[in-house]
């Protein structure tokens, strides 16, 4: 693979002082962000994938890099296997008296907290703020008098109701709640499915920024009150309007050192997941106005706009995607399909070594733990890998997988000393995986490429060299997973219930079509 042909996949910074939305065409769902000095930090939900809760950094709100994860592994054995749609939901990040705090809801376990004084370094092990089922989307807040609070929403799938917000007084060090708290807002009548609350204070008002109306079609609501327990005035401040951006909501109000205001939020585009946008924001009569073309204080998203004024120009950059496995650690673009184990892989001499893990042959590929995955980086692309197969053992299956609701994989299987090609397709909601043989494979090296067109159509190509790739198998349409977009990656398993061999990958490279 010629590295000079590798380019960044999605560039929002136009190089002329403007940016285009989305700023990240990648599934960083449920974003929250803060500014500390001249640095911006953003986090996102990651459900059952590990490491969990990605942490991104930027100097200008447009160019972002993943710098860390808040949790290395999920703290419950339940997540040793994939539990689609469970795990870490919408988190919140805050900075208080020299410490960074991240609140993480796990709807089946409770509200967890991790903290650090160095966001690039190690975060504390997760600790309970409250052990409770069905509470989601927590956000901490410290008032001027030193008292601390946590606002939360509710998951109807776990607790039987939604569209309500709740306020709990908490210990200032976030080690627990002080009392049972109380309901503070009922959105059933005017703000259905209100959730994802973020709590701020400005000019004597408490503000709750919260999405409502549902993930795909919803809008951004803001509540305000002079009392942290309400009653609350309400206003819709951002909606789709005449823009092509559906459901512009759930995110973070941030400012620049010179006082500009901005709003980060997601847009659910289906197969690519919930991608990230940046909107200008200003204040009128102590209400935020987000976006442009505001009518009665409700704006709509921008597609192109002047970059934030942060006092300096910073290089154009994007999160990592392609990987040549040249370091001694996995790139931060990678996550596993469940709680990972170090023995699943090695990095050596510029290769990723995947050790085939024992797997029940009846288990669907989407439910295999040791799938090494990363998010889609653009709406259309090809992804290519080169795998060395000479150390495979009988029963081993290895290849390139594209996950999602409907998933597909192109793999090499070794049985009785002979290798053959196989395509696997299925749906995570059904037990109906189809395994289609595609003929013998007589080389110890395989190049596998998958093309994704129109954010939907996935087609595989294989060859013994990068130059002789030929189409193989069936095109499989992508569908999103449970609250997540499609992820692509590599895997190696052994379906004879034994310790398998290994497969060596030279690279995993994304390119524009």
Regions found by a protein language model. Name each.
Residues 1-513:
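Carbohydrate-active catalytic/glycan-binding domains of CAZyme proteins
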